[in-house]
Each structure stands twice: as structure tokens, then as C-alpha cells.
Amino acid sequence: MKRISLTQHLIEQQRLHNKIPSELRLLIEVVGRACKSISHAVGKGALGEVLGSAGSENVQGEVQKKLDVISNEILLEANEWGGHLAAMASEEMETIHRIPNRYPKGEYLLMFDPLDGSSNIDVNVSIGTIFSVLKAPEGMTEPTEQDFMQPGTRQVAAGYAVYGPQTVLVLTTGDGVHCFTLDREMGAWVLTQKDIKIPEDTKEFAINASNQRHWFPPVKRYVDEMLAGSTGVRGKDFNMRWIASMVADVHRILNRGGIFMYPADAREPNKPGKLRLMYEANPMAFIVEQAGGAATDGTRRILDIQPEKLHQRVAVFLGSKNEVDLVTSYHQQ
């Protein structure tokens, strides 16, 4: 198989679809380089003294791991100076990060979850980085949080990296989903999967079943029907998989089908969900839809949601289309 690098792939996609201008290509390449650096830091583990808590909390009130902080800094520093961005926003930061005046400004906005699944860091389970790219509004001079308040349909690129047995980068620019594997010897992203498609039907689901007693009736009904197996109304047996790392769970679903669920529940009935719309749900929904799947919050298509605040949370149901459609229909009854 001919080896195609990330750069070559992006250039060829631009020639085919005319959707990846040079500034966007360069931005994606910079994010890719930052993910290589994060992969290197993750790979050192205890030898690099990067495990354990940083002794601080992020804007969500969550205790930060050392690698959360390191990964956030890597992404900020890598993307500040290139001239492709007007501003960045991170799950780990309270407000947006404007590009310093000493650097040229670009026309894109970058959002990221620098290290998703960080509760798994110390036990050596796959974790990852999620990112989303928006076009800055026309006529914008000094970026504000309001400039980021764009629905997911406005994303021009989205992707994630998984730091597991192999380090992979999954990317969409609106023309399918492609996967690159990091060649550690060459230090290069190499195209290893083109036009990934999620099977419409599945026998696997991912949900944190320890919260079952808190679920609302539509989720309870849906999961109970799957657990009833071949003797129940679904007429087939299902397996449950739960890694507690969204990138790892979604990557499995992308490759062999399944449904990922992180619903709202009765513990905080006034909160619409746990996952962040801008940093997690939107980029993953873009990727999943581009792979032929579906993504909703139980009632609405995630990509249609109009954000109201930077750290807005949503419920998430995504993956194989027929399963997402079914659980969504239960919420709408």
C-alpha cells in the first residue's frame, strides 16, 4: 500500500473537493504535531513524572491531572504563533485564549479537549485529544466568546487523537472520515483508513451502567430492551462496552459499530447532560455523521444546537444510525 502522509492527503482532498484552503491545512498540521507531542508525553508515563494530580481544578470544578495541564499548554503553544487562528477555547480554561499581539492573526477558531478520559491516565488505558475548528465571523476584530457561539453545522474540521497501543488521528473536513496512524520511527502521520463507515445496525452499546438507578424512563426502557437479549422485543443479544474514555469508545464504534450514550439523569434533573457541547459533542457528532452514523441529545440533532455558553453541557447519543434513531424516538414519545 502506498504510504500517504497527512499533508499529502489534505492537499489531494483540496484538489478533489476544494474545501481545505492552505490556512486550514496548515492549522490541521499544527494540531497534528501537537498531538504527536502529547502522545510522547503520555508514552513516558511514570518515567516522565507526568502521572498523578496537578493539585488544581479546571473551570468545571474537576481535579486536573498533570497531563491535562501539560496537554493544554502543548496545544496553546503550538497553535499561538502560526498565524492561522484568531482565538482558541479549551475545556480546561474558563474563557477564550486570544492570540497574543506579537503574532499574526488568522481566520479560524480552535476548540479542544486537550486530554479526554484523563481518569484513565494512571491506569494506562487509552485516552485522547478532541478538537473542532470554526471559521471566525466576518468582520471580527477582537474575538469574544460570542464569536464561538456557532452550531456544530458550522464546523470546517474536527478530529481526535487516541493515545493507545497505536497513536491514531481521526479527521473530517466534511468529506468523509479518515484515520492516520503515527509512524513513531518516522514521526509522521500515515493514512491507514479511508472513508470509514459506521454499520447502521449493531449489537454493542456503551453506557455507564452504574448510573442505571438515576436514568430517565426512555434510557431505562432502551437499555432494558437490549439487556433482554434474544428473548426480548429486540430479538438479539447485545454486549456492553464501557471504557470511560469518550475517544476510545467512539473509536471502537467508528470501526465496528455501536451506540455511545451519556444521558442526562435524575441526580441533577435541571442539567441537560454531562459532556461539553463545544469540545466533545460537536466534533464527535460531526465525525460520526460523516461516517454515516447519527448523533442526538435525545430529542435534537446535536449539530443543530445553538450554543449559548462556552462550557455548555448536553446529553449525547451517537453511533450506529438505527440505534440512535430508536433511542431518540423513545425520548420523543
UniProtKB/Swiss-Prot annotation:
Binding residues for Mg(2+) 2: 113, 116, 280
Known cofactor(s): Mg(2+)
Documented EC number(s): 3.1.3.11
Binding sites annotated in the UniProt record for substrate: 116-119, 208, 274
Keyword terms of this UniProt record: Carbohydrate metabolism, Cytoplasm, Hydrolase, Magnesium, Metal-binding
Pfam families: FBPase (PF00316), FBPase_C (PF18913)
Catalyses which reaction(s): beta-D-fructose 1,6-bisphosphate + H2O = beta-D-fructose 6-phosphate + phosphate
Family as reported in the entry's similarity comment: Belongs to the FBPase class 1 family.
Protein's name in the database: Fructose-1,6-bisphosphatase class 1
Organism: Herbaspirillum seropedicae
